[in-house]
UniProtKB/Swiss-Prot annotation:
UniProt keyword annotation of Lyase present: no
Protein species of origin: Aliivibrio salmonicida (strain LFI1238)
One cellular-component annotation, GO: cytosol
Entry keywords, A to Z: ATP-binding, Ligase, Magnesium, Metal-binding, Nucleotide-binding, Tricarboxylic acid cycle
HAMAP family noted in UniProt: Succ_CoA_beta
One Pfam match: ATP-grasp_2
UniProt enzyme class: ligase
Protein name, entry field: Succinate--CoA ligase [ADP-forming] subunit beta
All copies of domain ATP-grasp, residue ranges: 9-244
Its job: Succinyl-CoA synthetase functions in the citric acid cycle (TCA), coupling the hydrolysis of succinyl-CoA to the synthesis of either ATP or GTP and thus represents the only step of substrate-level phosphorylation in the TCA. The beta subunit provides nucleotide specificity of the enzyme and binds the substrate succinate, while the binding sites for coenzyme A and phosphate are found in the alpha subunit.
EC number(s) from the headed UniProt entry: 6.2.1.5
Amino acid sequence: MNLHEYQAKQLFAEYGLPVPEGYACDTAQEAFEAAGRISTAKKVVKCQVHAGGRGKAGGVELHDTKEGVKEFAQKWLGKNLVTFQTDAKGQPVTKVLVEEASNIANELYLGAVVDRATRRIVFMASTEGGVDIEKIAEETPELIHQAAIDPLVGPQAFQGRELAFKLGLEGDQIKQFVKIFLGLGNMFAQYDLALLEINPLVVTAEGNLLCLDGKINIDSNAMYRQPKLREMHDPSQEDEREAHAAQWELNYVALDGSIGCMVNGAGLAMGTMDIVNLHGGQPANFLDVGGGATKERVTEAFKIILSDSNVKAVLVNIFGGIVRCDLIADGIIGAVEEVGVKVPVVVRLEGNNAPLGSQKLAESGLNIIAATSLTEAAEKVVAAAEGK
């Protein structure tokens, strides 16, 4: 689950990290009043969406007057912001963040992720702030400095000092950086974060550090024990089908193709998408119904796939291990009867109760195309999507 910038900064402030004075606003009038409370001559106003590239897309502006801030809010609230990280539709803007402008002398980068190789939280810092860190990692990886956090003792001050020295910080700036580093390290563990990023972490003209931006991603598997963060969830930033799928514990990701895929197991789902591509098709989604799929969940999965108007055919690829193929068949039959499927459906069942599942499908009287191998299933669904 992602947080908005203003939400990330709220958490930063709770841990004593320096953030600009700012206010999240739902209306243009609120933005106007917020600008009046900010003492700096210039005000920054930012669209709040779960996507990067806001500045280049016109979603971040600097204004001298309260009226300018209000006009910006009127322009964007209720509209969609399209950036290089969104689809053509963009993300809806329901809030804008109005905050004080900062005198920036230097921009740094500070972030943290869970490193699966070392099984530790790893901090990354760089003097190249304000730019795409992936690009820096690819072109000049020597500019990225790392510190791995021992889970037994947590973040240590000496690690913060080492990073500060490598970033060229001096004097009181080192103390400020260590405080930020320790705060972020503790916050990362306490809130079950998967990713944390401050880009840029700026050095102001006065020589102080300031968290000018904030990006936080929370481990969805830990949301059950993070009620505070659950309240920060913004469903407007998610694909409606993905949000609906999550309610049924289905792993669904919308894509741009025309062949709907329903598979059990993430690895098999990716392999299915690959072989569909190999035979000239384009998957419309990734959908893993999981090992504990029930008839109801399969029916719901089918509904979600068919709610995409781009879907021209559906491929169901099930390997029965924990899940029984006959239950999958019941779900397919129920969904087809309930929804009234107008597109071809290709089904490949293997494993636990596969013969019984195939028998149920054959006796249903529905227009379902059977396949006995993954290659055959891919060939048939691609042909069906093309109307052959």
